[in-house]
Amino acid sequence: MDRERQKRAPIYEALEAFKKKRVVPFDVPGHKRGRGNPELVQLLGEKCVSLDVNSMKPLDNLCHPVSVIKEAEELAADAFGAAAAYLMVGGTTSAVQSMILSVCEAGDKIILPRNVHKSVINAMVLCGAVPVYVNPEMNQKLGISLGMEVEKVKQAIEDNPDAVAVFVNNPTYYGICSDIRTIVELAHA
């Protein structure tokens, strides 16, 4: 990881530079950087609403990033040690649904833990995917479910060689991490 490069905040820096241009907004959002909604300014603060602008050329485009958003995604991937990272505006739900809908079709099997978020179930309903559940163990003392066990994932893959994806909650809602590196290696084998 390039620690010096990680000090950059390309989207924020572009928003600050754009703000200094004193562009008069005639598009969305309707609060017009707070001038159209003083209550919003009181609630969120001037700094927040002054940077809430539409996607204009110097601010890049999330659907086809080529400048500051692309750089931010590259920085995120570098920070997480990932091959790629994608910024989403619809939260985790839209990210999860995008992942599943882009990989699974009707009848496709997807290996996943039983304790997934409802967004996963919703995406499977939308595309017609078939779940292959790997039940997580429970920590009886704490009363919480644990991560996916590598051996159970391996068995699910062996039992379902036609599965098109493995979905992992990592970390779980309780902060438990699975051995994601080994699970990824199994899935890609």
At which residue positions do the language-model features occur?
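Short, acidic/turn-prone active-site loops that include or flank metal/cofactor-
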Residues: 115-118, 135-141
